[in-house]
C-alpha cells in the first residue's frame, strides 16, 4: 500500500546549497545573508561557507534549521516544506538520509530510514486514514516484509513489492476471518488457506482474490467439497461429502451440480446421470433402497418423461412419468404375468387400456382409478365375451354377453350379474325377454320356447309362477228362505 505523502519527498528534497561568499567570516559568527534567489540564511559560517548551525529560508515557504558542513546541509536538522510537510532527522548532501521522521499536512507520518532523499529501509508509516505500516520500504513504497494494520481491524503481515502485497502473507479481517497464503498484485493468488469464524475452511488455489483452481472447501455445516473452483464457485469436476453421509461426485457449474454426476445417499439410494441447476434433470438411472431401479428421464429430481422402472419382485413399468408418478401411456408387467397396456393417472390404470391375464382373460376398455369403469370388452378364458358397461371393476349397466355354449344375453347388469331388463337366448334356442334379478328370471317376462310355445307372466327364482286363482265370494242366500 502506498501513501500520497510518501511521494512528496521527491518534490521537496533539499539540494546542497552552493553559495559564493566574497568575504570569509570567523567560524561560529552568526551572520544573516540574503541571496539572489531570495533565500535568506541566518547562521554561522566558516571559510566563507555555511558551517555549523543555521536557518535557511526560501520565498516559497521552505525552511531548514539545522547542521551545515562546508556549505552543505549535513547532520541533524528540521525542514519545513511549502506543502506543509515537516521532516526532522538526519541529512546528507542536502537531503534526508539516515534516520528521520516526516509529518505530512494531512496528519500522516513516517519515521525510519532514508537514503538520498528517499524513504528506504525499515520504518513506521502512519496514514491519515488511521492505517499503520511497519516494515521495509523502497523508494517510499512498501517493499519487503511488513505489517499493515487498519482501524477497522484489518491486518496484513507478509511480503510487499513496489507498494503492493505480493509473495507470502497473512490477512486477518475485521470479522475474524484469516487468510494465510500467496499474494499477487495486492490480491489473494496462488495457494492459500481461508478460515472463517463460522467454521468454513478453504485450502487451495486462488486467482484475483477468489477461490479458483483445485481446492478443498469445508462448509460451516460440515459439508466438504474437493475439486475445481472458479471465481469463488464450484466449477468443473469435484466431489461433495455431505455432513449427513450422502455424497455427490461429478460436474459442477456456477456452484451447482450440473452435467453428469453420481449421487449416493446413506440409505442406499444411488442416482447416476444428468444434473441441471443443482437438480436431477435429463437422462439418468436411479436405484432405490427397496431394490427398485428406474432408468429414463428426470425433471426437478423426479422421474418425468419416458422411463422404465423394474421392481424388486420383477414387475416393470415402461412409459410416461410426471413429477415422480406413473402418468400417461405405458406398459405395466406384473410378476403374476398380468400385462397392462394403456393410459395411467397418478400411478393407476386410468383412461383407455388393455389388461391381459396369464389364464387368457383380457379386458380392453375404460379404466378409472385402477378399476374397470365405463365401456369395455372382457374376453374370458373359456371364450366368453362381454361387451358393455363396467362400474367399480364389475359388469354394471348395459351389456351383452356371448358364451361359447351358445348362451347370449343383452340387457341390464348389476354388481357383475344379469339384473334388470333384457333378452336371454339359451343354448337350446329358448328366448326369454323380461326382468332379471341376480342372474335369475325375476318379475314380468315372456319365454318363447324353441318348440314354439310361450310362457308369459311373473317369474321367480327362474321359474314361471302359477297365475293366482281368483277368490269368488259366496252367493248370498235367497230372500224369505227359512233356516
Language model regions located:
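Bacterial N-terminal signal peptides that target proteins for export
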Residues: 1-11
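Bacterial N-terminal signal peptides
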Residues: 10-20
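Sec/Tat signal peptide C-region and signal peptidase I cleavage site
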Residues: 22-27
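An edge-strand/N-cap motif at the start of beta-rich repeat modules
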Residues: 30-44
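Conserved anchor residues at repeat-unit boundaries in beta-strand-based tandem repeats, strongest
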Residues: 40-51, 63-74, 87-97, 109-119, ...
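Short beta-strand elements of solenoid repeat domains
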Residues: 55-58, 65, 78-81, 88, ...
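Compositionally biased, proline/threonine/alanine/serine-rich low-complexity intrinsically disordered stretches
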Residues: 463-483
Amino acid at each position: 500500500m502506498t501513501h500520497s505523502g510518501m511521494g512528496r519527498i521527491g518534490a521537496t528534497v533539499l539540494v546542497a546549497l552552493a553559495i559564493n561568499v566574497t568575504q570569509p567570516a570567523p567560524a561560529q559568527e552568526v551572520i544573516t545573508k540574503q541571496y539572489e534567489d531570495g533565500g535568506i540564511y541566518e547562521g554561522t559560517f566558516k571559510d566563507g561557507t555555511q558551517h555549523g548551525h543555521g536557518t535557511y529560508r526560501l520565498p516559497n515557504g521552505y525552511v531548514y534549521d539545522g547542521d551545515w558542513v562546508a556549505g552543505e546541509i549535513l547532520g541533524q536538522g528540521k525542514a519545513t516544506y511549502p506543502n506543509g510537510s515537516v521532516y526532522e532527522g538526519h541529512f546528507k548532501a542536502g537531503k534526508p538520509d539516515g534516520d528521520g521522521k516526516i509529518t505530512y499536512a494531512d496528519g500522516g507520518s513516517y519515521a525510519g530510514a532514508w537514503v538520498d532523499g528517499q524513504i528506504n529501509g525499515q520504518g513506521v508509516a502512519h496514514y491519515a486514514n488511521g492505517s499503520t505500516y511497519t516494515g521495509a520500504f523502497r523508494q517510499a513504497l512498501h517493499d519487503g516484509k511488513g505489517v499493515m494494520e487498519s482501524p477497522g481491524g484489518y491486518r496484513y503481515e507478509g511480503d510487499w513489492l513496489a507498494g503492493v502485497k505480493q509473495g507470502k502473507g497473512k490477512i486477518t479481517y475485521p470479522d475474524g476471518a484469516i487468510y494465510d497464503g500467496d499474494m499477487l498484485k495486492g490480491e489473494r493468488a496462488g495457494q492459500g488457506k481461508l478460515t472463517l469464524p463460522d467454521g468454513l475452511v478453504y485450502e487451495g488455489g486462488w486467482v484475483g482474490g477468489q477461490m479458483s483452481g483445485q481446492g478443498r472447501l469445508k462448509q460451516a455445516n460440515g459439508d466438504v467439497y474437493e475439486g475445481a473452483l472458479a471465481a469463488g464457485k464450484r466449477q468443473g469436476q469435484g466431489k461433495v461429502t455431505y455432513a449427513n453421509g450422502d455424497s455427490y461426485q461429478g460436474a459442477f457449474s456456477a456452484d451447482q451440480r450440473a452435467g453428469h454426476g453420481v449421487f449416493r445417499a446413506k440409505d442406499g439410494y444411488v442416482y447416476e446421470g444428468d444434473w441441471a441447476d443443482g437438480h436431477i434433470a435429463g437422462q439418468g438411472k436411479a436405484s432405490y433402497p427397496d431394490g427398485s431401479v428406474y432408468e429414463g428421464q428426470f425433471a426437478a429430481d423426479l422421474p418425468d418423461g419416458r422411463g422404465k422402472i423394474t421392481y424388486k419382485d420383477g414387475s416393470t413399468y415402461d412409459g410416461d412419468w410426471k413429477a415422480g408418478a406413473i402418468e400417461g401411456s405405458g406398459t405395466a408387467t406384473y410378476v403374476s404375468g398380468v400385462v397392462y397396456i394403456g393410459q395411467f393417472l397418478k400411478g393407476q390404470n386410468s383412461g383407455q387400456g388393455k389388461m391381459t391375464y396369464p389364464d387368457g382373460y383380457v379386458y380392453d376398455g375404460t379404466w378409472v382409478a385402477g378399476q374397470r369403469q365405463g365401456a369395455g370388452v372382457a374376453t374370458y378364458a373359456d371364450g366368453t365375451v362381454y361387451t358393455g358397461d363396467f362400474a367399480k371393476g364389475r359388469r354394471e349397466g348395459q351389456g351383452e354377453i356371448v358364451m361359447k355354449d351358445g348362451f347370449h344375453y343383452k340387457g341390464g347388469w348389476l354388481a357383475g350379474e344379469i339384473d334388470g331388463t333384457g333378452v336371454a337366448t339359451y343354448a337350446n334356442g329358448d328366448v326369454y325377454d323380461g326382468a332379471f334379478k341376480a342372474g335369475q328370471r325375476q318379475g314380468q317376462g315372456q319365454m318363447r320356447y324353441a318348440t314354439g310355445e310361450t310362457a308369459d307372466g311373473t317369474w321367480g327364482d327362474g321359474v314361471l309362477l302359477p297365475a293366482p286363482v281368483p277368490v269368488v265370494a259366496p252367493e248370498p242366500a235367497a230372500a224369505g228362505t227359512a233356516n
